[in-house]
Design a protein with these regions (language model features):
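Outer-membrane beta-barrel transmembrane domain signature
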Residues: 30-31, 38-44, 57, 66-70, ...
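Conserved internal helical-beta-strand scaffold that buttresses enzyme catalytic cores
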Residues: 46-48
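N-terminal carbohydrate-binding/catalytic regions of secreted carbohydrate-active enzymes
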Residues: 61-62
Length: 206
């Protein structure tokens, strides 16, 4: 219970601080995004939902089954956006983790786009409350090329505790498409190794 109270206070204070940094004259509406990640793992199946909310510089995020199974995390961050030829969004964040794993995690998300090429990364370092031996570095990186507005393909890498193999980083191929506010991306990881698996990510923004 103490851990939950500490995490809640940190997230609330972080969000309040970030919101107070800049209040533009013209307020922009909230932008929301929901991802449902379906992991088709050999002899197992896992759903990893993610909810994101952005307003101006403020970024809020909630995840389940991300840092660990049956584990919830809540995040507050600050968006840095800009660029002309190379467009970028960089979001440092702070998160609290509660469930089978409990702790606090600094994190970072960034996207760099140049013409049809894009690199997206989300990473964090979890400091476990119970044992320093359970500290863990997470990372998910996608490098894609989009020949048009509705199709993309590329490569991906994940470092996670959800699925353990002989590989420290799960590596794979991806392809996806978009229709209006919806996106669907398919991943095939560890092809050619002993334990390949499939990930389908369904996303909607509004």
């Amino acid at each position: 219970m103490k851990a939950l109270l500490v995490i809640s206070a940190l997230i609330i204070n972080s969000g309040t601080f970030l919101w107070a940094q800049e209040v533009p004259a013209t307020e922009k509406p909230w932008n929301f995004g929901v991802d449902a990640n379906f992991y088709f793992i050999p002899d197992d199946f896992l759903v990893l939902p993610v909810f994101k909310a952005d307003k101006n510089k403020l970024h809020l995020e909630a995840r389940y089954n991300y840092e660990d199974r049956e584990t919830f995390s809540a995040w507050a961050g600050y968006n840095f956006m800009g660029g002309k030829k190379v467009e970028y969004t960089i979001t440092p964040m702070l998160g609290g983790v509660v469930g089978l794993s409990n702790g606090i995690a600094p994190g970072l998300e960034f996207t760099f786009t140049y013409k049809g090429f894009e690199i997206y990364n989300e990473s964090e370092f979890l400091f476990e409350f119970e044992s320093i031996e359970n500290n863990f570095y997470y990372q998910w990186t996608d490098l894609t090329y989009s020949p048009n507005d509705w199709f993309w393909f590329g490569i991906s890498g994940q470092r996670t505790r959800l699925y353990k193999t002989d590989l420290d980083v799960q590596r794979g191929l991806l392809a996806g498409g978009a229709y209006k506010s919806w996106e669907l991306t398919g991943y095939l990881y560890n092809l050619g190794f002993d334990d390949p698996f499939v990930l389908l990510t369904l996303s909607i923004s509004f």
